[in-house]
Design a protein with these regions (language model features):
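Bacterial N-terminal signal peptides that target proteins for export
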Residues: 1-7
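Compositionally biased, proline/threonine/alanine/serine-rich low-complexity intrinsically disordered stretches
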Residues: 21-41, 77, 86-91, 98, ...
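Hydrophobic h-region of N-terminal signal peptides that target proteins for export
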Residues: 11-20
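Soluble non-cytosolic domains of exported or imported proteins
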Residues: 45-49, 90-99, 168-179
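N-terminal "mature-domain start" segment
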Residues: 25-65
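Solvent-exposed, polar/charged alpha-helical surfaces in well-ordered, non-transmembrane soluble domains
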Residues: 52, 56, 98, 102, ...
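Surface-exposed amphipathic alpha-helical segments
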Residues: 58, 158-207
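Conserved polar/disulfide-associated segments of primarily extracytoplasmic proteins
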Residues: 22, 60-154, 160-161
Length: 207
């Protein structure tokens, strides 16, 4: 059985020193490309906007600190995006990676067993054109074989964490779709052209 580490809180306080960052409450812009309807989510980072295309047909709900996404008809599957504003630049070095690895294992459900780090990948998906690091962990919980991934990136003064959890049999396809959506995330500087888009996107999403 996995024991939750009592040092995780210290790690997060010292290694991942951060404060509230991007507001992940989404505005929504619907558009059609090649006959297919898509949704673009627009977040706010001070005067800049951040644009993100979620995987097709995934539902979502956002708050200031977190965006949650769920694929259709998949039990035990969920993705989240978190953004924190960094007090100072933090390189993606082994100290940070090991701290996040401990955090990821500590976050597993109580009673989880057989946790194993399956992969550690550098730059598996660029985030806003910059470097990233990915951890993939397998484990068993609630009678299911599950896989959890975390993609971490420091972009400008923001630390981003993209998590995905799914059954082992569902993970590969969902992981591919989620990483493709991560690739779409990018910052947009203030301009008249983009401010028009942002105004249109203030309409609430039809759920």
């Amino acid at each position: 059985m996995i024991r939750r580490s009592t040092i995780v809180g210290v790690i997060l306080a010292t290694v991942i020193s951060a404060k509230a960052g991007i507001d992940l409450t989404p505005s929504v812009n619907d558009y059609v490309s090649e006959g297919i309807r898509y949704q673009k989510l627009i977040f706010h980072d001070d005067k800049r906007s951040v644009e993100y295309n979620p995987p097709a047909n995934w539902t979502y709900a956002g708050s200031a600190g977190q965006l949650r996404l769920s694929p259709p008809k998949k039990s035990f599957a969920e993705a989240t995006i978190e953004a924190m504003s960094l007090d100072k630049p933090q390189p993606l070095d082994q100290t940070l990676v090991k701290a996040v690895e401990q955090r990821l294992i500590a976050e597993l459900p109580p009673g989880s067993q057989f946790a194993k780090v399956e992969q550690e990948l550098e730059n598996s998906v660029p985030v806003n054109g910059g470097p990233s690091f990915e951890l993939i962990i397998s484990y068993q919980a609630m009678g299911e074989k599950l896989v959890k991934s975390l993609v971490m990136a420091n972009v400008r003064d923001t630390q981003l964490m993209f998590r995905l959890t799914a059954r082992k049999d569902d993970f590969e396809a969902l992981h591919r779709d989620f990483k493709a959506s991560i690739f779409s995330l990018h910052w947009v500087e203030p301009s008249e052209g983009h401010s028009g888009i942002a105004k249109e996107a203030q309409q609430p999403a039809a759920r």
